[in-house]
Amino acid sequence: MNPLIQSLTEGQLRTDIPSFRPGDTVRVHAKVVEGNRERIQIFEGVVIARKGAGISENYTVRKISNGVGVERIFPIHTPRVEKIEVVRYGKVRRAKLYYLRALQGKAARIKEIRR
């Protein structure tokens, strides 16, 4: 990477992010603007993918809400996310868990690792 770009992005990288991988269940505290108010919205689900590197790294979180699957993509280093909590660690053998989209109920469960 260009040293100039690298030096500019280094100051914007966050250091308060816990280590998590696909298969882990996370609770993301995202800032949402509604009109002139700003509030924190909690989005809890399974990390099904991590993409990119450096400042442009993203992760996808999937949850089931009222029987409908909902996925949100969050940039890791965004100031819009106040904090990320790892609720439980999952044991999976894939980096991308897109196959969970086709599974329902108990079939979509992920085995837990004790850490």
Swiss-Prot record:
Record Gene3D superfamilies:
2.30.30.790
Query: Mind listing the UniProt keywords for this protein, alphabetically?
Result: Ribonucleoprotein, Ribosomal protein
Q: Name one GO cellular component term.
A: cytosolic large ribosomal subunit
Q: Does the keyword Magnesium apply?
A: no
Task: Note one Pfam family from the annotation.
Answer: Ribosomal_L19
Mind telling me which InterPro entries this protein's record contains?
Ribosomal_bL19, Ribosomal_bL19_CS, Ribosomal_bL19_sf, Translation_prot_SH3-like_sf
Give a GO molecular function annotation for the protein: structural constituent of ribosome
- Give me any GO biological process, just one: translation
Cystine connections: none
Q: Does the keyword Transit peptide apply?
A: no
Q: What does this protein do?
A: This protein is located at the 30S-50S ribosomal subunit interface and may play a role in the structure and function of the aminoacyl-tRNA binding site.
> Would you identify the family this protein belongs to, as annotated?
Belongs to the bacterial ribosomal protein bL19 family.
Matching NCBIfam families:
rplS_bact
Q: List the HAMAP family.
A: Ribosomal_bL19
Q: What is this protein called?
A: Large ribosomal subunit protein bL19
| Gene field | rplS
